[in-house]
Design a protein with these regions (language model features):
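Active-site rim/adjacent substrate-binding subdomains
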Residues: 1-141, 146-174
């Protein structure tokens, strides 16, 4: 496993649609392992393959949401999604603050669906169907947008700069 460089905006790869993964081979497995290590090192809650200069439809997400606002986050769950698509989105939406590892020092207020259903393959090629709500749904939408060449700043209602020490648990970098 290796920590890869994260591509920062502006970069063409961030604005291009990623290619479908046709074969899950050793090279793809290495990329997934590297993406997980890179995301954890950043630190972030999600990373799309184009963010490490790989134009493939792969996303890794690691997140644990507290059951109550006063509690510590639950144990984090790791998701590896190959060729993910959002099959359902709730009509109910919410504006939330997002960061992005490819946009250091930038936060944005983005409206997203409160719940989504994601279909994908896991790293073994087995089909997955995940129903997510809240922050996990937001993270999935953000990362899948990366695979479609859509940047969170394009969906933003407000964009603002922050100092590096202002990034918090409430405003994680995705």
């Amino acid at each position: 496993m290796a920590i890869r460089d994260i591509v920062n905006y502006p970069s063409e790869i961030l604005e291009q649609k990623a290619q479908r993964v046709e074969r899950i081979d050793a090279e793809v497995q290495t990329l997934i392992d590297d993406m997980i290590e890179t995301m954890r090192n950043a630190p972030g809650v999600g990373l799309a393959a184009p963010q490490v200069n790989a134009p493939l439809r792969i996303v890794v997400v690691e997140y644990g949401e507290p059951e109550n606002e006063d509690e510590e986050p639950a144990e984090k769950q790791l998701f590896t999604l190959i060729n993910p698509e959002i099959s359902r989105m709730s009509r109910e939406k919410e504006i939330g603050t997002e960061g992005c590892l490819s946009f250091p020092g930038i936060l944005a207020e983005v409206e997203r669906s409160l719940a989504v259903t994601v279909v994908a393959q896991d790293r073994n090629g087995d089909p997955l169907k995940i129903k997510a709500e809240g922050w996990l749904a937001r993270i999935f939408q953000h990362e899948i947008d990366h695979l479609n060449g859509v940047l969170f700043t394009e969906r933003a209602q407000k964009v603002y700069e922050i100092k590096p020490d202002e990034e918090t648990e409430e405003n994680p970098a995705a």
